[in-house]
Amino acid sequence: MRSQPHVLGIVLAGGEGKRLFPLTADRAKPAVPFGGAYRLIDFVLSNLVNAGYLRLCVLTQYKSHSLDRHISQTWRLSGFAGEYITPVPAQQRLGPRWYTGSADAIMQSLNLIYDEDPDYIVVFGADHVYRMDPEQMVSHHIDSGAGVTVAGIRVPRSEASAFGCIDSDESGRITQFLEKPAHPPGTPDDPNMTFASMGNYVFTTKVLVDSIRADAENSDSDHDMGGDIIPALVEAGEAGVYDFADNQVPGATDRDHGYWRDVGTIDAFYDAHMDLVSVHPVFNLYNKHWPIRGAAENLPPAKFAQGGLAQECIVGSGSILSAATVRNSVLSSNVVVDDGATVEGSVLMPGVRIGRGAVVRRAILDKNVVVGEGEIIGVDLDRDRERFAVSNGGVVTVGKGVWV
């Protein structure tokens, strides 16, 4: 029986998330609220903790206050057994400069690796929505003998040009790592599908440290994990692919097995929320066998008064619907929808208030937005464009704290 390997988790959470503006105007992308009760960072941390990995460093940088606070308050572990989940802001250990890329973030944090001295390091992104058992990927990595293993999700070749793509042979060795190619490669067993990189990696420690140090000396590098480190290891013959379809999460349904969403744009963020609200959701937040953990707020239950109605909705704690109609929507905590108001196909973040008789359709309202009596959002997009951000898909986004 193989002894348990010593694994350190590094979560790359410094993303600025420009394509999610205005949701990222005041916070880092991994801190953006999601699903009525979570932040994006909670999905990767839940996956790692559920797998038993309890020594995790979260590298932060861009507007990280709310993210650092959330990690410190929500993800506290007992230190008696050496367990920790700690936010690590840019330390400027190598001089007065910030991180210049994801690989540079690890370069500036090598002291964390030296202190922990792990056998293997999982390096995961912080801004995707999915369930995964990372321990299965680590076991695959150890058995394969690769220096780095890249998680790949199967996507149709016709859609793969939007991703970093993996070309591999039948043994799982990666032969090419291509950034958004015009002609994506097929998988060894299906020419109509392509392995897209999920941005999740497992490294043998020496391989990661050596490659990070070599990259730091390369003045032509962008110091990016996917753009520089992985291609260099592919060229050296040290990279393998892990098929995400092989990952078996306890409690997963046939419908949500293999679910993974990059929510880097407003339209993708909106669509991922709509995946949550059907009777048989595409992604099931209610899997008790592999829970997604978030901040536990001390709030009263949601209240429906004077005939308030919610259909195909998620409604957060402390929310009140008073003689209002809400359909196909996600409401976070402390949302109030007043008499006669209608909310359809929308995402309302904590503290939002919808006034009497107001109408909100296909919209994302950030925290503490107040919509006045009789106001209309999401019906006249030309008018909305003069006031708010409107995505290519017609989703209206109202920034944090705006009074309409």
Swiss-Prot record:
<dbReference type="InterPro" id="IPR011004">
    <property type="entry name" value="Trimer_LpxA-like_sf"/>
</dbReference>
<dbReference type="InterPro" id="IPR029044">
    <property type="entry name" value="Nucleotide-diphossugar_trans"/>
</dbReference>
<feature type="binding site">
    <location>
        <position position="99"/>
    </location>
    <ligand>
        <name>alpha-D-glucose 1-phosphate</name>
    </ligand>
</feature>
<keyword id="KW-0119">Carbohydrate metabolism</keyword>
<dbReference type="GO" id="GO:0005524">
    <property type="term" value="F:ATP binding"/>
</dbReference>
<dbReference type="Pfam" id="PF00483">
    <property type="entry name" value="NTP_transferase"/>
</dbReference>
<feature type="binding site">
    <location>
        <position position="197"/>
    </location>
    <ligand>
        <name>alpha-D-glucose 1-phosphate</name>
    </ligand>
</feature>
<comment type="similarity">
    <text>Belongs to the bacterial/plant glucose-1-phosphate adenylyltransferase family.</text>
</comment>
<protein>
    <recommendedName>
        <fullName>Glucose-1-phosphate adenylyltransferase</fullName>
        <ecNumber>2.7.7.27</ecNumber>
    </recommendedName>
</protein>
<keyword id="KW-0808">Transferase</keyword>
<dbReference type="GO" id="GO:0008878">
    <property type="term" value="F:glucose-1-phosphate adenylyltransferase activity"/>
</dbReference>
<comment type="pathway">
    <text>Glycan biosynthesis; glycogen biosynthesis.</text>
</comment>
<keyword id="KW-0321">Glycogen metabolism</keyword>
<dbReference type="InterPro" id="IPR005836">
    <property type="entry name" value="ADP_Glu_pyroP_CS"/>
</dbReference>
<feature type="binding site">
    <location>
        <begin position="179"/>
        <end position="180"/>
    </location>
    <ligand>
        <name>alpha-D-glucose 1-phosphate</name>
    </ligand>
</feature>
<dbReference type="GO" id="GO:0005978">
    <property type="term" value="P:glycogen biosynthetic process"/>
</dbReference>
<keyword id="KW-0067">ATP-binding</keyword>
<keyword id="KW-0547">Nucleotide-binding</keyword>
<comment type="function">
    <text>Involved in the biosynthesis of ADP-glucose, a building block required for the elongation reactions to produce glycogen. Catalyzes the reaction between ATP and alpha-D-glucose 1-phosphate (G1P) to produce pyrophosphate and ADP-Glc.</text>
</comment>
<dbReference type="InterPro" id="IPR005835">
    <property type="entry name" value="NTP_transferase_dom"/>
</dbReference>
<comment type="subunit">
    <text>Homotetramer.</text>
</comment>
<dbReference type="InterPro" id="IPR011831">
    <property type="entry name" value="ADP-Glc_PPase"/>
</dbReference>
<keyword id="KW-0548">Nucleotidyltransferase</keyword>
<keyword id="KW-0320">Glycogen biosynthesis</keyword>
<dbReference type="InterPro" id="IPR056818">
    <property type="entry name" value="GlmU/GlgC-like_hexapep"/>
</dbReference>
<feature type="binding site">
    <location>
        <position position="164"/>
    </location>
    <ligand>
        <name>alpha-D-glucose 1-phosphate</name>
    </ligand>
</feature>
<dbReference type="Pfam" id="PF24894">
    <property type="entry name" value="Hexapep_GlmU"/>
</dbReference>
<dbReference type="InterPro" id="IPR023049">
    <property type="entry name" value="GlgC_bac"/>
</dbReference>
